[in-house]
Each structure stands twice: as structure tokens, then as C-alpha cells.
């Protein structure tokens, strides 16, 4: 079993992981950093992010106060206001650094940054690169990181578990690209593993978003919070044969798109004064209720009234995808339905990204900073990632860590071949159980799904005594464990109380 040592270990190659590597290297160019990616370095949620980054830029019309208020309102009273203030006031500085790193953003006719509008925002403040902002960020940052002599990148590395001793995180174990069992010792370990959208049957997230960081945290008794708040994006294209849904950016609704029911009515105007530009939780719930009312599987996005040439210029990715699927947006309505999109809860961290285990940190979607509360405001996620990576870099480079890994029998991994199709059955069953109604539906639906997933977890553990001897097996276990914690938090209080009461009597 091979061992690797480094000062800083970063698990994940989205904006959080990449920008942390860059910030650390700017402060200390000689700092040894190891960056892990589960597959290719660009396969992550950031790569697929369409909308942009929320930044107060036009101070004649907008203000930090307005952005703060919009964020707090979207979060339904569960945001940490101190965190919200900090992230939003830091945004312009972090945006300037992205621009210095070569990220190109759209300009308006006057040569300034073009500011888009999205749901829940009271002002235009979304900076963007057409409808593929995340792609632009990833493709500009990756070459910068690859050129840094102090950063080693390992792709196709699957992390199975953290190594925790006496409350300290000493690194992790996993399998390298050849399937070789590996221990990585680190003075500081940073989880930037992204979200858990693949827990659900329909998601906008790529196949790598399997809750790995959260699941490793669960197994190491690292504190989590608000895992039940999974954000569903209201406008994913309805394609029943696909589990990874194509996202239709919220910016299109800011541009003027309408959402219609089967009668061609803009039903959202009856639900909220902002109609299509209400926050994502409001729009997704309204769509779900409308589909239930109609006994249908989708509603419709109307783009027919929008100026076609300008639309093609601003949203080329969406236009091309619609065309490939046979839709003429000047004549056809686009079928849409909500899809699991963002994990608002996660690993609890403080203002510098530290967890409740020493030398273990978390940033990005896998973390819970308090910024998003119960519902993330559109385009605040990339902002959170870069602000926290900057702050964590400052902390890590000003802190002296001393650590010694004490290898023992529990850290030994052995690679074992598995029956892929048998493991896949567990994953498929989970995704059939997990849908919007599983966490936001009627009480009995939530309880039923929790019972089904708990039973699935029991069967998995009975069949596979060891989950960590193959990446696909461990990843499937991560999905089921993450689903159970999401559902456990979603259970009605009365159900939890009754279960606790029965256990006490026993």
C-alpha cells in the first residue's frame, strides 16, 4: 500500500479547489499542494454552471444592503447574517482576481460588465460568460494550476475515507488511477468535493456528484447541518429517458421567458408577485403542485416572444441544445420540470472553512457556511466558493501544522473486483425512491421514502461487509448514506419523537 505525503491536500477540482490552489500558491509558491480529482480535472459542478456570479457592481442602482436582503429572504430565516455580509462585501475583490486570472465575462454596449437578472434578486447583478460561466472559469483556471510547480494534480483518484486520530485529520485513504490502495498524509486536508445531486432520480448535476465528502464526514463523525435543504432547479428540460437533466439557466427567465401550464397560462403570477422571478424554492414548488393538479409530468417554458438573434448570442448553449432536441424556440414550447440541483446544507465550517475536526476543512458545495440557509439565492454559490477559498488560503499559510500519521491495520485497503450490475441495482433503486416529493411532499411520502432508503442501506451493509474495496462500491455507499441523512432530517418531528420514545422503552 503506497503512501504519499504533502502539506496541503485538496479533494476536488471545481472552483473551490482550483481557486484555493491558486491563492495558496500566490502567497507561498513553495508550498507543497496535492490536488485530487475523482475523474478528469474538469468534471465537476462548476464546469456545468451556466448562470454566473452575483456581485454588486452598479452602485448607482444596487448596494450591498440589497444583495444581503435578497440573500436573507431567499434563505427563509436560516442564513447567518454575519456570513452573508462578509461574502457579499468581499465579492468585488474576488471578482477582480478572477478577471486577473484571465476569466472573460460579457460586456454591455458601453464596455462595462453586462449584469443579468435572476430569480430572487431585486437588481441586475449577475456577471456571466454567456450561458456557460462555469465552463469559462474552469477552462481558464485549469491551465494556470497545471503550470504551478508546487501543485501536483492526481486525476482518477477515488477517496474512500478520512484518517482521523484523536480529533485530528491526518489525511485520507483511497485508490489511485491504477486501482492502487493509497494513503495520503497531509498537514491540512480540504474537502472541496461538491454536492450530492446523483442521490436523486433526476438532477442537473454530473455523474460525479455523489456526496462523497459528506459521506466521508458522516463516517468520521464530522458535524453536518441542514442536509434536508436540497434545492431543486425549476427549469430543467424534461427528458424522461435521462437522469442527468439539461439545465436551462435562470438567466433566461430574467431575460423574459415565461412558464406556462397546459392551458398556456402563466400560473406563477397567481403564486408570487414576482412570477417567474420568484426564488427557486417557490417556483419549483409551484411547478410541482401544478403538475400534480394536471396529473402531468412537466410544464412549459415559453421563449417564443424573445428576440431570436440576441437570444442566440446570449444563450448559445441553451439554444443549441434545444435545436439538437428538435425544438424551434420561435415556435415550440420547451417541456420543463424541477431537477435536484444544489445541496444547501453540508459539513459545518467556521469563517475560515474549518470543521470540528482539527486540520480538516471544507469549502464549496459540500460545506455549510450559513450563507444559503434553507434556499440558495441564484448565483451565490460560485461566489461563496471563491470567497471561502481566499479566506482559507490566508489561514492555512499563516498557520503551522505538525502531524504524524500512525498507520495501523484499519488504514489498509485492498482492491477487489465486484459484480458491477449488482451494485448498480442498489444505485438505481435509490434513485427511483428519491424525488422532489421525497423531501418536500406530504408527511407520509417522506416517511415512506425514509423507510425504503433505510432498508436499502441495511441490505447493502448485509451484502457488502466492506464498502471500501472498490471505488464504484464505495461511491454507491456514499449515495445511500447521504440520502439517508437527507431524509432523516426531513422527517416530521412527530415521527422522530415516536421512534425515540419506542427505542427508550425497549
What is each PLM-predicted segment?
Residues 2-16:
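Beta1/beta-strand and adjacent pyrophosphate-binding region of the FAD-binding site
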Residues 3-6, 20-23, 29-32, 40-42, ...:
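Glycine- and aromatic-enriched mobile tails/lids
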Residues 9-11, 184-193:
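Short hydrophobic core segments
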Residues 39-72, 76:
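Conserved N-terminal glycine-rich FAD pyrophosphate-binding loop of Rossmann-like flavoproteins
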Residues 79-92, 125-143, 154, 203-211, ...:
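Short beta-strand to alpha-helix junction loop
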Residues 100-180, 192, 236-239, 259:
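Conserved redox-cofactor binding core of oxidoreductases
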Residues 161-181, 327-369:
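FAD-site-proximal beta/loop scaffold in flavoenzymes
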Residues 216, 222-332, 385-386, 395-399:
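An anion/pyrophosphate-binding glycine-rich loop and adjacent beta-alpha core
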